[in-house]
Amino acid sequence: RVSVTSSINTWNENESLNSRIMVAGGGGGGYYNSDANYGTGGAGGGLTGYNGSGTNGPGTGGTQVSGGYDKSASSFGIGGFGYGGIGTRWTYNASGGSGWYGGGGSYASSGGGGSSYISGHAGCIGVNSSGKSLTSTYSKVADSISYTGYKFTNTQMIDGQGYPWTIVKSSASSGMPSPTSASLITGNTGSGYAKITYLGS
């Protein structure tokens, strides 16, 4: 975020959300019920989050321009800009993962994953200072650049299942770098990580 929030405990102020220049999509929540049915949440995405699993209203993944939703009723469980949708049933449900746009909450299945965003990355769609998408369909790199003007170069985007993304998802999974070792991992459990390495002299 280029614009900080007014308080460390406040995450959803519009000016700050609109100024984000790099976002990692989060995975949706899983579910389990008394009939021993269960399912994993949709993985955090590249340009698009993964849909949740299950047959009873799983959440869909967030995209570059909209949040996911409950597949059984598209007007419920809707994720938004910077947050996942909530589960739409009082039990046996799961919420969507956060992200650039969050995944949808479920009815009685698992939640969808959120989408990722990098300002300057081909395929991403930025927003203006009011939080409105610059375009509905990506066509040029300028579409991806945040209104703040800050952007990244030589970018790499890898989703929670280990697939790299440019304008489209790669056909082969490569894994993603582990934040704690030199190994590659597929997805991450627990809290997220930000690893910054100074490359100057």
Task: Label each region the model flagged.
Residues R1-S201:
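Low-complexity, glycine/proline-biased repetitive segments and flexible coils/loops
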